[in-house]
Amino acid sequence: MGKMKAVEVRAPGGPLQLVERDVPEPAAGQVLIDVRACGICHSDVFTREGLWPGLAFPRVPGHEVVGVIAAVGPGVHEWRPGQRVGVGWHGGHCGRCEPCRRGDFILCRRGLVPGLSYDGGYAERMLAPVEALAQIPDPLSDLEAAPLLCAGITTFNALRNSGARAGEVVAILGIGGLGHLGVQFAAKMGFETVAIARGQDKEPLAKQLGARHYIDSSAQNMAEALTALGGAKLILATVTSGKAMSAALGGLGIDGKLIMVGVSEEPVEVPIAPFIMGRRSVQGWPSGTSMDSQDTLAFSALTGIRPMIEEFPLERAEEAYHRMLSGAARFRVVLKTA
């Protein structure tokens, strides 16, 4: 048994500490991954602060994991050493609960999440169950693929399951870590893409990402601007402000929908009568399965979609985490482990 470097949290609220651990061996139905890159996601706060039910310490965070299979456990026949794989938020499912029996694995009542249910990707090696694995296409580098396994799949999956059709007005509220990918996906899917953010200085970036229209929410009324475009079939809310989401609702067209993928502690206030009379709705969307991740990666490779990233070595995980948490990192932060 060899040794590996890992970054762990030993107690709720504790620092990220670089340690040496024994390399684990894969059990039945598992693979051992040589981790090449792991994205840092805001949801890693759940691990750092001990906010997940049943979370055991010490724990290695990380659920945007890219690497190469180093070994397979007993009974694993579909995967082989040397394959490039990714593991996202969907880290396994039971296959027995009602959502699983209906094929809705992301809502498994006993679902597993890397970095929460078991040790994640802030490490040189990691174990994962085979149902959590996604194939990674060659055109994507390790660093590019990592954020697509959470921020990417969440926005891609929400858009493709929204009911919006090519040519319809789709607005992306916020163009940060999630939103800058959402704008790219929406444009490549053929929607009349509208990017909404604060400040006129963000318009060049929005247009570069593929937006046809830009709304400066600090200077314009979002609802009025969207209505002038005919009303949005979909508003994908990637921001963490319930007030901003509420302010955008008036810009929905008939049968329009607001899908929330950004988490806010503020409530979203819905004007009931206009929603009834216009058949409008509000919905949440929670990531997706490993096959959804694989679809996201394939679509990104095919269409040239790439995340904008900042790279840090594993040894600087604490610094990288705080850069993400403080908002100093504009888009996505990725740890390079190999």
Residue ranges and their predicted role:
Residues L252-G253:
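Helix-to-beta-strand junctions that scaffold the AdoMet/dcAdoMet cofactor pocket
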Residues P24-C38, L51-E98, Q135-L143:
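Glycine-rich beta-strand-centered segment in the early N-terminal region that forms part
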Residues M1-V66, A128, K336-A338:
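Short N-terminal strand-loop motif that marks the start
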Residues K257-I259, V270-E310:
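Rossmann-fold dehydrogenase core element
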